[in-house]
């Protein structure tokens, strides 16, 4: 049985004061241990957040890493640097990175390779736009994004997939549990074609307006192994409720 994973993507939010209050409401959640929990703050807060969660069962993740190694790349943060900051995870391929910063499948595959080489576990985000879904291409587009990274990972690498339909991110809209399950099953079957030995072990998360009111129903689906949570991860009570829903 796959252990549920709940990852909080803070995006470009937070302050030292707000982060402290948020984490104080999460670190003692009773469900920690029964569920794997990751928080992914903005780069400037990695060190302070790591200090705040170091004695808890919460793991630290980065929201991104560079496709390059260390060197003359002004403004870039390498995977090695993230690992040096005690990150265990890194979010890659998020739709906001694809849309706002023109990251294509080739760039994302390179980032995945850098991440695993540095000992980070990628949370690979894939998902279709509303136009893709309405044209009947949702599965085609999503599986193509997954296909792009198979050359960057090995069966024994640690990584997870997060299905995030772009039309559901930050909109309040959520894919139905049945729609999520259908796509998660397709993703798992695609993994089976490349790495049959890990297809039933790898975790596939759902992301896209996940909140306490819909989490339990989503988690009841056989191929939904947790969530990548955006806005709701910024409210401790809401995030803890989602974590608890993953246990039930």
UniProtKB/Swiss-Prot annotation:
Homodimer. It is found in: Cytoplasm. It comes from the Bacteria. GO terms for molecular function: triose-phosphate isomerase activity. This is Triosephosphate isomerase. It comes from Hahella chejuensis (strain KCTC 2396). Substrate binds at residues 9-11, 170, 209, 230-231. SUPFAM superfamilies: Triosephosphate isomerase (TIM) (SSF51351). InterPro entries: Aldolase_TIM (IPR013785), TIM_sf (IPR035990), TrioseP_Isoase_bac/euk (IPR022896), Triosephosphate_isomerase (IPR000652), Triosephosphate_isomerase_AS (IPR020861). The active site is at residues 94, 164. One of its GO terms (biological process) is glycolytic process. It catalyses: D-glyceraldehyde 3-phosphate = dihydroxyacetone phosphate. CDD domains: TIM. Its EC number is 5.3.1.1.
């Amino acid at each position: 049985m796959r252990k549920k994973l709940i990852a909080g993507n803070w995006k470009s939010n937070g302050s030292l004061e707000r982060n402290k209050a948020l984490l104080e409401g999460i670190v003692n959640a009773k469900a920690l241990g029964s569920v794997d929990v990751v928080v992914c703050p903005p780069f400037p807060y990695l060190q302070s957040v790591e200090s705040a969660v170091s004695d808890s069962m919460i793991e630290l993740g980065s929201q991104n890493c560079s496709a390059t190694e260390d060197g003359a790349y002004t403004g870039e943060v390498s995977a090695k640097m993230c690992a040096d900051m005690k990150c265990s995870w890194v979010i890659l391929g998020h739709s906001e990175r694809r849309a706002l910063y023109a990251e294509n499948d080739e760039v994302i595959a390179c980032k995945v390779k850098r991440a695993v080489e540095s000992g980070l576990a990628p949370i690979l985000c894939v998902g279709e736009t509303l136009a893709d879904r309405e044209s009947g291409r949702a599965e085609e587009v999503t599986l193509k994004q997954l296909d792009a990274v198979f050359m960057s990972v090995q069966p024994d690498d640690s990584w997870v997939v997060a299905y995030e339909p772009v039309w559901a991110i930050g909109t309040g809209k959520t894919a139905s549990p049945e729609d999520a399950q259908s796509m998660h099953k397709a993703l798992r079957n695609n993994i089976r074609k490349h790495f049959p030995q890990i297809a039933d072990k790898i975790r596939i998360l759902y992301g896209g307006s996940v909140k306490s009111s819909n989490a339990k129903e989503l988690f009841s689906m056989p191929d939904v192994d947790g969530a990548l949570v955006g806005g709701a991860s910024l409210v401790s009570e809401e995030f803890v409720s989602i974590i608890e829903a993953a246990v039930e």
